[in-house]
Amino acid sequence: LVSNLSATRQIGIQVKTNQGSKPEWVLSEKAENFYADNLFYVFVNLKSRDELPDFYVVPNRVVADYIKDSHRQWLNTPGKKGQSHKDNPVRKFRDKKGQYLNRWDLLGL
């Protein structure tokens, strides 16, 4: 829980980390259906020891909609050998275009 200096606005922040070159994070199925206007994810991409991490600040609703849509698309796309994908609780969030990179302004604090 974070608030502005005057304590007139409070938000919740969930932090998820990964390590590697892909800005991709694993979430659970329950993140699809949880909406709150004052909840944000900060996805952290840890790089090599010599590099600073990247921070992606994303509103909860954006994450929920993205993982719901991308999972549905994955289920409807045949696998490498043409087989159907089996549903599972794993969801992935990606920011391919980097539109949420360092978007601390979205927090509105």
Language model features: what each stretch is:
Residues V2-L109:
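Mixed-charge (Asp/Glu-Lys/Arg
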